[in-house]
Amino acid sequence: MTTQTLLIELLTEELPPKALNNLGNHFAAAVAEGLEKAQLVDGAAEFTAYASPRRLAVQVKNVKAVQADQKIVKKGPAVANAVKDGAPTKALEGFARGAGAKIEDLTIVHDGKQDVYAYEYVQTGKPLGGLLEDIINAAVKKLPIPKVMRWGSSTFTFVRPVHGLIVLHGGDIVNVSVLGLQSSNQTLGHRFLSNGEITIENADSYAAQMREQGKVVASFAERKAAIQTALEGQARRLNATVAADEALLDEVTALVEYPVVLEAGFEEHFLAVPQECLILTMQQNQKYFPLLDQNGKLMNRFLLVSNLQTEDPSHIIRGNERVLRARLSDAEFFYKQDQKATLESRLPKLANVVYHNKIGSQAERIERLQSIAAHIAKALDADAAAAERAARLAKADLVTEMVGEFPELQGTMGKYYARLDGETEEIAEAIEQHYQPRFAGDKLPESKIAAAVALADKLETLVGIWGIGLIPTGDKDPYALRRAALGILRMLMQYGLDVNELIQTAFDSFPKGLLNEKTPSETADFMQARLAVLLQNDYPQDIVAAVLAKQPRRLDDLTAKLQAVAAFKQLPEAAALAAANKRVQNLLKKADAELGEVNESLLQQDEEKALFAAAQGLQPKIAAAVAEGNFQTALSELASVKPQVDAFFDGVMVMAEDAAVKQNRLNLLNRLAEQMNAVADIALLGE
């Protein structure tokens, strides 16, 4: 059967730029899936997604014009039960009637268990046109659109009004109706660069015709690559690098159909404003691409992506420069205004900034942060006074003009204003870095002072918000407590502090009775659960569970322990020792009395005497290795007692009739368990 390329295009009004690529990919994948289910393609569909500001399209290779005929076998009652006294039973008659057949048309087949009556027939394949309308409608309904709209007098809904529909199989129009539109082979190109309607001659010529006749680069990926290449080329010419992230590049790609990269500039005096402010306003407000010199300093040149190609782009450049000048003038004004007051003088205003109505204002919060940060700094052997000062000023920039306009700059502006106020560089940097890490993979604070304030900030948030009952549930975490917990854990894995003690310190900083009394224990459990999630990104679940079963309160040696357990797991003796450890733990649960020291005089059998001697020799070796942080050595020592452990369980009845002997053997196993689990609960390995 011959096949041809299928093309579907929805011509729309301007689609949401941040969602465009996702919409295009979902639409294409859903159409391809529908074609596969309808058996209009053989195997997995080979498709290309297209998405530009005014269109979603998909091109699918090797689509059949008609489904293949299918042999259908409907199975009915068992032969043994279908005929009675030479006449068909009601079950057989009902099956034939339901199948639309006569009894004499039925055949007998084997269903794998027994012979059954069946009706076999050939189902004629349906034409593409009879199936495609439902496939497209289903694909439209599957799109991830949080809010839809209606347009004109239409009752149909979509993310934006739809004005055109192309459905081509090869060069033939497939007659379907979707969203109130009849399919055709005509579309529109670029709003300003194309000349009216474009007739797509063939499904395979879509991309080329759109580019040549419509001045539209229909492929999102192709536009993005073209923009990136042009940006990098322009930057190299200027001996600069582009300050841009993937999100900005994606958004700009979604805003243009025929991208042209242009160079523009602004007055040098604006560079006196902190470059973070200028970069943010260029990227966020104007969707421009700032340029950095070889030292990472902002240049007074930038790149913009125009949706127009002209012989003389100077008017486009001047227009964009004029708009940016107004934006940068605002930033310059805010910066100058903010310098009229010190951070210290702004602190009283924080009393009017509500943190949460149940736990007070930012001013009250600052008092808590100061005490927590000073405590942590002492524990880190850092300057407690500097940490307290940094914590005092950490939130003062929240009431500045610049942060009011650009909340993303909180902390960053605090750093600049602290420098202008004569604060030390260490305090200024701590003010900025106390928000770190902001997200997974973000860098940690660089100094102990900054780490103390950052830990204080996140601990106070976690304990305070949790303590008033605003606990994360499902996908709801409005106060980002999970993120705060992960930030705390990442810092504590660098600094050797007791996590439970820090939680208690944060809890004690709140007025007595304000928070739920169970908050310290509940947040400690929450942190343990988040720690497991964090570690499972890099280590198998059983290794993480084994290490965390010891409920470590200091996290700076966690990585070493995890690596040691991973190495131990590879030893030939590991599986048997893990199983033995599990058996030991199960036996210890049956102890009637409190476990204590081993009484050598009650050791009766050679196997238990040998195990006692081995455990005695093992204890100082493991203790020394653990004390030195050499956890791999500690675990590898366990391999030496495997023969004695095996012999003990093969030859000794632990739960002896003599109560004293039984207790002594349990004491021996308890001593062994302490050594086996000095680093991790190895019984959990392999589970």
Curated annotation (Swiss-Prot):
Presence of the UniProt keyword Transcription regulation in the record: no
| Pfam families membership | DALR_1, tRNA_synt_2f
* Keyword Protein biosynthesis found: yes
Q: What is its EC number?
A: 6.1.1.14
The signal peptide here is none
Single GO BP term: glycyl-tRNA aminoacylation
Q: Which UniProt keywords apply?
A: Aminoacyl-tRNA synthetase, ATP-binding, Cytoplasm, Ligase, Nucleotide-binding, Protein biosynthesis
Question: InterPro entries from the entry?
Answer: DALR_anticod-bd, Gly-tRNA-synth_bsu, Gly-tRNA-synth_heterodimer
Q: What is its main location?
A: cytoplasm
GO (cellular component) term, any one: cytosol
What's a Gene Ontology MF term here? ATP binding
The set of disulfide-linked cysteines is: none
Q: Which PANTHER family match?
A: GLYCINE--TRNA LIGASE, CHLOROPLASTIC_MITOCHONDRIAL 2 (PTHR30075:SF2), GLYCYL-TRNA SYNTHETASE (PTHR30075)
Under which name does UniProt file this protein? Glycine--tRNA ligase beta subunit
